[in-house]
Amino acid sequence: LSLRRQRQMCIRDRSHVEVPLPEGAMRFTAMPNAVEGKGIWAASGVNAANVGMTATETITSNPRVLGADPLVVYQPARGEQPEVPGGIGEEDIVYLVLPYIHTAREGVERLGRLLETYGTYEMNGIAFQDHDEIWWLETIGGPHWMAVKVPDDHYVAMPNQLGIDHFDLEDALGEQKEYMCSADLKEFIETYHLDLSMDGNFNPRDAFGSHDDSDHVYNLSLIHISE
């Protein structure tokens, strides 16, 4: 897609949310959905700055988290009640982020701002890559999120579940060398008593992830196969 096709306002098909687009979009190549009529749904893409991202990894949460931080789901108009737009999601994340970032870190920062502003209607895992770094971001409920820098000697094998199992909140809310998150994530965890660790080591997978039979039958099997 080129600059000539850039729009100043992005209106999403599924959620009807309006997101203003900044100036200075770069050219990028993406893999859109082959079926028209449901939005772009780009699975992945690379832009002119050689930054890549993928944003179609559906993950899961649990009732405790979603009760405290509901997904931002589109509500159609009913009678005299106007419609309520939903958040952003898989159909638009690549389009809203990739043309405007020059590094993987910038990708995390831009998507993080969008999530905190508009929320999301689904749980997703998103990867960002440039010449020097790879970052993995996972959404938590509506506007909350967290991201980790993938070490150079590691790789990510992620099934359809929330998978980050270690997180340094001090770094994420401070220098952000290897971790980033939504600005109020620490308060969110404390307010709703989501930290289930007994040893003082916060495990996001225990706090935010799913723990049901489908994980054992489906997701854990995918991990073993991919590794």
Model-derived features: where do they sit?
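Short linear motifs in intrinsically disordered
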Residues: I11, A30-E36, L114-G119
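Soluble extracytoplasmic regions of secretory-pathway and membrane proteins
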Residues: R5, L137-T139
